[in-house]
Amino acid sequence: VKIAVIEYRSTPPKSALELIEAIERRNHTPVYLKAHILDAVITGGDISIYHGREEVNIDGAILRNIGFFLSLEVFMKRLGVLEALAQKTPVVNNPLASFTARDKWRCLLRLSTHGIPVPETLITENPFSAMRFVTSRKKAVLKPIMGSLGLGSTLISDPDTAFTISRSLKNIGIPSYYQIYLEKPGYDYRVFVVGDQVIGAMKRVSSYWKTNIAQGAQGIAVKAEEEPEVYELALKATRILGLEYAGVDIAYDTSTQKYFVLEVNAFPHWEGLRRATGVNPPDFIVEYVVNKAKR
C-alpha cells in the first residue's frame, strides 16, 4: 500500500518523519508530498493530480499541514487540489473538515450548533465590541483565529487594552477572536481520537493560565474510567466535525462546574501525549489509513 504524508515544508518535520517511519514499519510505501507543488488537472470527466511533473498515484494520504500566512488565493488553490485528491483516494483528515477545525470560530460554531458546550466567544472587526465583551465578562482570552501551541493567546482584563489591540489588528486587516476566561482547576485535557476511539488522553497541568504542553505544562495520563465525560465529549466533537483523527482540548470550568470544548485540532502534535501516556499516535493513524485504503 502506498501512503502519502502531505506537508508544506521542503524537508519533512518530525511529525511527518514519524508517520513515514510508521508506514515503513508496516512494510508499506511512504510518499512525501509538498502542498505547494501539488497541482490538479481536469480533463473531460477525469481528475489528475501532479507533484511537480510526476503524476500522483497513491492508495491513501495523511494530511498534516498546507502552510501558514497564505494569501486567500493560495489557500483556496491548495484546498481545491486536496479536495480533488480526496475524490480519488482517502485523505485523512478530509480537507474541508480539516479547515473547518483549523478555523477556531467555524469549529466552535459547528460544535455549538450540534449541542456541544463551548465557551462564550466573540468574533469581531469592531474594537468597541471587543471592549464591551471584556467589560462585561471581566476576563477574556484573545486568540489567533488560526493558531496552535498557545502562541499568540493573550489574557486580557482591561477593556482599554482590548480596544487598543483590536484596533491595531483591524488596521492590518485581522479580526479579533475573544473567548471568555474559564476558571480552570490548574489543568485542562488533551484527548487524542483516531477513528471512533480515544487512543490516549492527558491532563495538562500548569500553574500558568496557559496549559499547553508547548508552554511548559506537564502531561498526566487520564483513563476513560477516570473522566468518562471528557472521553465522550471528545468523540462527539470529532465526529461532528467529520474528522478521523484529532486532538481535542477540553476544560472544566470551576465557576459553572461544566466541561467545555475549547478547540479541536485537525493537525495535532503528539509528543507531550506520548510522554504522558506511552501511546504512539502515528502507529494508530497509519493503521487507520491503511485499513481505509484497503476497503
What are these regions (language model features)?
Residues 123, 193-194, 252:
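Generic beta-strand structural signal
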Residues 1-6, 55, 82-88, 95-183, ...:
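Active-site nucleotide/adenylate-binding loops and adjacent lid/helix of ATP-dependent enzymes
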Residues 175, 210-259, 283-294:
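A long amphipathic alpha-helix within ATP-dependent nucleotide-binding catalytic cores
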Residues 140, 199-200, 246, 258-262:
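Protein kinase-like catalytic core scaffold
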